[in-house]
Structure formats: structure tokens, C-alpha cells
Amino acid sequence: MRVWTIQPLEVLSRFEDGQVLYANPAHVPQEFRHAYDWMRAQMQRRIPGYGGHYPWWSWHSPRPDLRQSGYLPCGTQGMRLELEIEPSQVLLSDFDAWHLVLNRGYLALSEHEDEAWHRRFEAAVLDRWAWPLPEPWHSDIVTSWERVFDLEALAASNYWGEGPHYIQATFEALRLADVHGVTPFVAR
């Protein structure tokens, strides 16, 4: 499976003969650790032989346009690595829907479902910012996150828009042998 990951230039220099690189957990922002840990649990369930490391993030589609900003801090020398990874070692998810996981939100497939769930939730839960939430609300939210992987349902949903869907790909190990192209750039 072809994917692209945006990395600082120094990542390539970390490779030694046959070495495998794993994502550094120190780079996971504390406020999103719950989401990254949830993704690790999903990778454990869905990727054979997954070893529990934090994921590398990449794009499955579309290929990142290096003329855009936001990939790295402005002025940073970076590179877009084109990778070819065994499909069984990659977990695809919808980038926009992923933000509900990051923000501990309920991932609805329609406006009606979203509004109905939130009406019930707001009537029943006093502290909406507590985490974990009381049951069954916590389980409802976490279960809804599984929809981040249902690319067909999200694409078919008017609620998630008709435009291009950005599909991200997570994988555990970055191998030099998987790198099939390197495009250097300076972040805007």
C-alpha cells in the first residue's frame, strides 16, 4: 500500500543498516495521549503482530501537497517520504472524523443522530468535560469512535461532506526498505 509521511529531515539520518524506526512517544502531546492510546489499542486488535509502539502517521489519500502549510513548523526542513507498506500492517482512518477522537466527542453519521445524542447527553450529564464520563455515555462515545475506520459509511454520509475525504494511515514500524521516494521541502 502506498502512503506518504511528512517528517523532519533528520529522520532519514536515524536509519542504520536494516534498522527499524519506531515513533517516539515523547512527541505525543499530553492532551491527545488518550486518543493515541486508543489508536494503539485499535492497531493491536486489527494489525497482526503489532508490538504496541506508538504509530507513525501518514496519508493514504490524497498525497500531501507540499505547497500547503501546516505539515511542520514554518521554515523547518522536512521531507515527504513515499512508502510502500504491506497492507496488513496499515490501519486506515478518516482524518476529519479522527478529530472527534482527539476531542473526546461522539462520532455521529448524521445531523439527526448527532443532535439526538447530544440532547440526551446534555440532559443527563452535569459535567460534560469530565473524563471518563459516567456510563453509558463514556462507552457510547468510545464505541462511536470505531466509525473512524468505516470509510465507506463516512463517505456516503451527507453529514461528513461530499468533498475529498482525507484518509490517514497509521503503521508501527518505519523501515528504510519501505521508502520508495524522498521529496525534501521547507515548511510554509
Regions found by a protein language model. Give the residues of each.
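An acidic/histidine-cluster motif and surrounding catalytic segment
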Residues: R33-Q42
